[in-house]
Amino acid sequence: MEDNYKTIMEYYNGSSETSVKNYLENISYNNFHLYNLFPQINDSTFIPIELSITEDDANNSNYDSIIISDVLKKYPNVSGTIDYDNDGIVDNLTIILRNKADNAGSNSSLVSHKSDYPGGNDITLSNKSLGTYNMLNTYSIRNTKSSVIIHEFMHSLGYPDLYNSNNDYPVFTWDIMGNVISPPPYPLAYLRSYFTNWLSIDEITKSGTITLNTQDNKDGNQAYIIKSPLNDYEFFVVEYRKKPTLFDKIDRSISNSGVIVYRINTTITGLSNKFGSYGVYVYRDNSFALNSTPSSAVYNTVFSKELGRTTVGNSDLNSKDKALLYSDGTNSGIVLSEIGSSSSNSITLNVSIPNKGDLDVWNELKYDDINKNSGYKVQTSIEMNNKIYVGSITNNKLYTTVYDNGNWSTISNGTNIVIGDVSPSTMEFKIINN
């Protein structure tokens, strides 16, 4: 068990940038500090706890409550602080189960996971209630080193899974929550801002030139939010990722240095990708192509002058080819161009965003012209009291509608009228007693 002790201690508290403690300090710009307690240590050796269940049991079913009960009966008290926010609940409990192979059944205790203890106050640690816990296993730690420990602990901080069961790799190696790979990558900048407030990201709504800095620059522009006027609930984020030359470094597992762009869908609960819809999706060649291969998700997602990939997006709103699409398949019209060199710690690019004044306002307001197929019609509109009134005459019938509080409603639906020579310039629209 002495070798296990050295290995586990290195993964948690080691000097490497990718140890759990140092990783969290790096990605948070020293805003978050993790203090680990190991109550089973005796003379640089871990003293194992024998459980009341077998490895086969834990392979096939969820025995978390029994495992936790067995552990805390053995160690009901620990020395050191376990409740830094003083809410009466243990900040986080981690249990590592020993196993010989990766053959655990779905949702069993031997699948590495984060959960919340359901038992309330029926069991305590140093008189503190249990809440969030991580259940890990030696097989996954042996294969991914600190990465699986980090992944599950990030869940404890509120971060979602960014992978799914459809094998379309929505984020993959661009975030530790998208793929448990060693060495671990950074979490995406937007998630570090949204879930833990470790950085702030400026929002862009007008065309211009921007400069992005590397993720390790706490005072730089790690990312920008880019919004098009075409969608109030979805937007795109660009960030610059720099692949280090040394192996045991954060982001060593990404494919290349350069700019990535990803879509955020704020209508998805917790921004999770796990349940079929995508809160976060990284752009790749041929737009946001589903069912892409792992290599496509790795190599076709990054842009720089060195890679010969310097443009992203399509300004033709009627085209989807290589466009930055919303989740419903419509084109945002956003274009990133003249993406620069990734040779330094910053990169420059141009951003083009559709001008709201140039868009089809009727399409934006979802106006449904019931006479749109008529060969001859006269139509006019007027705005009054924050309402839009539309009058349309075709085949000696008058149709009037009103737009109010985001909805269209009918005033008259085909009233018979007698007209002579009517043109748009002679049709007069009056609102009386409104």
Specify the residue positions occupied by each region the protein language model found.
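Fold-level signature of zinc-dependent metallopeptidase catalytic domains
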Residues: 1-9
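Extracellular hydrolytic enzyme modules, especially secreted metalloproteases
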Residues: 21-26, 92-94, 98-253, 265-267
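Active-site-proximal segments of metallohydrolase catalytic domains
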Residues: 15-126
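Hydrophobic strand positions within the blades of repeat-based beta-sheet folds
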Residues: 381, 390-391, 400, 429
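Extracellular low-complexity, Gly/Ser/Thr-rich intrinsically disordered linkers
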Residues: 216-357
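Trp- and S/T/G-rich repeat-edge/linker motifs of beta-rich repeat architectures
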Residues: 357-375, 397-425, 431
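Entry beta-strands of beta-propeller and related beta-repeat scaffolds
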Residues: 234-236, 385-391, 433-434
